């Protein structure tokens, strides 16, 4: 704001007596490269920057980095892009997939034609089916909007979610999957190469940030370098 620049000018002598290590600001509309506010903020930041020639200067987050070198200054602050998340509207795929989410079965059972699955009986079996239950749910950040509306991967096979996503459980259709003794130990992929945080966020009209930050504390986290 202009008031900030005026205040800095008034306090300039006091500021010069102090050692300011870093001057930092944040772009409000960096995710929209066509927004006029980006250039407006850039110009104001440069005015403030001129009063701190010996300090480091930082303006850009992930989206700001993609606006070009004029926005970079001494350091940038990538956030969502470190996790492979898109940070701009209509952004092309330029990052590698980083985050994956996997779960294991806790139960497999047979149901008969006409049986219903889950709260609200939103899915009715059209045939005799084999149903698997995975140990995660909306309490772990998996949105209820994916009820009857998502596919989970087991290696190269796509498996439908059937029934409503509940607090702690998700049910899937294993009818066409060959069941072996090892299936209870196998990992089913929820977030990964097929459904990245970018794809998932578009499916429920939100942003990758929300998908990522909603992942609950009950998941075991593995950091692989």
Residue ranges and their predicted role:
Residues 1-104, 108-112:
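Active-site loop/helix belt of alpha/beta enzymes
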């Amino acid at each position: 704001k202009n008031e900030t620049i005026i205040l800095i000018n008034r306090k300039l002598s006091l500021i010069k007596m102090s050692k300011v290590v870093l001057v930092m600001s944040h772009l409000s509309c960096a995710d929209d490269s066509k927004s006029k506010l980006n250039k407006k903020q850039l110009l104001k930041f440069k005015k403030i920057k001129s009063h701190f020639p010996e300090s480091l200067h930082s303006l850009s987050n992930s989206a700001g980095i993609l606006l070009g070198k004029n926005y970079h200054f001494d350091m940038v602050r990538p956030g969502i892009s470190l996790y492979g998340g898109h940070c701009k509207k209509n952004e092309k795929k330029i990052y590698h997939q980083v985050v994956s989410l996997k779960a294991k079965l806790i139960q497999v059972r047979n149901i008969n034609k006409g049986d219903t699955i889950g709260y609200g009986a939103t899915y009715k079996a059209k045939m005799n089916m084999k149903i698997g239950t995975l140990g995660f749910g909306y309490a772990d950040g998996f949105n209820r909007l994916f009820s009857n509306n998502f596919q989970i991967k087991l290696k190269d096979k796509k498996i439908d979610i059937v029934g409503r996503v509940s607090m702690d459980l998700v049910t899937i259709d294993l009818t066409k999957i060959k069941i072996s003794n090892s299936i209870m130990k196998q990992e089913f992929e929820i977030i990964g190469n097929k459904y990245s945080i970018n794809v998932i966020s578009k499916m429920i009209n939100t942003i990758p940030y929300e998908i990522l930050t909603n992942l609950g504390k009950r998941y075991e986290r593995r950091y692989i370098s």
